[in-house]
Amino acid sequence: MAKPLVTIVGRPNVGKSTLFNKLAGKRVSIVEDTPGVTRDRIYAESEWVGKKFTIIDTGGIEPENNDIILTQMRRQAQIAIEMSDVIIFMVDGKQGLTDTDNEVAIMLRKSKKPIVLVVNKIDKNVEENNIYEFYNLGIGDPVSISSSQGLGIGDMLDEVVNKFKSEGEDEEEEEYIKIAFVGKPNVGKSSLTNRILGEERVIVSDIPGTTRDAIDSFLETDFGKLVLIDTAGLRRKSRIKEEIERYSAVRTMAAIERCDVCTLILDATEPISEQDERIIGYAHENNKAILVIVNKWDLIEKDDKTMENFKKNLEMKFSFMAYAPFLFISAKTGQRVHKVLSEIKKCYDNYSKRIATGVLNDVISNAVLMKEPPVVAFKRLKIFYVTQTDIKPPTFIFFVNNPELLHFSYRRYLENKLRQSFDFEGTGIKMIFKERKN
């Protein structure tokens, strides 16, 4: 289940960035008294009573006007609101209710998202009675806090996490293989999605994603039940190019967290960018199955070494995830598109693979016989037994005499033996070394 997204919204200078920095545990947003200082949406991870979530700080929402920066901030806040699972609507208890607060409240009510109304700047110098006028917003019971002094934040977070969906609400989605097509704008995500949907012709339904604003396409295919998580709508004609990456970052992150198989789509005509590396790095860190698709292969002049050389370049760029397969396609012409779902299914099967304990220990025992662990600090690692404890990704616990005796090269050797024996192409694997207690 993906971490919920919580967005802090409100007009400028009510204290959103101060609260964001408290929740993020570090100073991420610039905090000044000048309206409009938080121009970009910024996000960070947070946790309360064991529940993890992503918190988003937005630029303040001003009434419509001709100021280009304020217009962009308002648009960005609207995108964040669309994506959110819960919205923290912050108002200023010292200044009181304003016309802009009422305008924001109207916009939030239209979103039909769970809202926690927070009255900030209620401290020793401001009476608690100041919160009552905010009932007029029609949002619900206000929660009073002082973000600068840290007062009332626990009560506010209790309200926030109580509005999260329970895990049971996502059970219907669990029977599907969740696939995210991610990548920079214009690499062909939309074309590939449309090509796959058009070829399969077995769409069950197009319904709003259960936890995000993207449209998820539910399919029943020869490869099982699939969900294509749509991140293709990141670019809209009304948005200038410079805004696209800012809008896409959180959506891409959310799609990766939801998916089982992260499919990075690259443009064969362009060099691999830092953005590509960040996207795939995030999928790797989140232990997702990964497939790399190189699109627009029809536009490349080729000889018998072109694909091999391209693969070598990719392997150097993505050396930290050598397990990921590559597929060269053209969404425009349909070249090799028929292989996309079968490759995704293979990655997923390996991602959710279980190995019998007996077979697993036979492989590791033989590996140790072929090559003993190196001596570290005059001692040698001894592996007593290994067991698989989880899937998605496959997770193995090795019970040993002393984990500190494990050399990184021997860890890599054991991983290679597991991969050679059980075919974990397309997925990372976790290897945990624990001391066996007598």
From Swiss-Prot:
A Pfam match: KH_dom-like
Every EngA-type G domain range: 4-168, 177-352
Gene3D superfamilies named in the record: 3.30.300.20, P-loop containing nucleotide triphosphate hydrolases
Binding site for GTP 2: 183-190, 230-234, 295-298
Domain KH-like: residue ranges: 353-437
Record CDD domains: EngA1 (cd01894), EngA2 (cd01895)
Gene Ontology molecular function terms on file: GTP binding; ribosome binding
Family annotation (InterPro entries): G_ENGA, GTP-bd, GTPase_Der, KH_dom-like, KH_dom-like_a/b, P-loop_NTPase, Small_GTP-bd
Any one biological process term the GO annotation gives: ribosome biogenesis
PROSITE patterns the UniProt entry points to: G_ENGA
Residues that, per the record, bind GTP 1: 10-17, 57-61, 120-123
Keywords (A to Z) from UniProt: GTP-binding, Nucleotide-binding, Repeat, Ribosome biogenesis
NCBIfam families xref list: GTPase_EngA, small_GTP
Family: Belongs to the TRAFAC class TrmE-Era-EngA-EngB-Septin-like GTPase superfamily. EngA (Der) GTPase family.
Quaternary structure note: Associates with the 50S ribosomal subunit.
Role, per record: GTPase that plays an essential role in the late steps of ribosome biogenesis.
Listed name of the protein: GTPase Der
Organism ancestry: Bacteria, Bacillati, Bacillota, Clostridia, Eubacteriales
Encoding gene (name): der
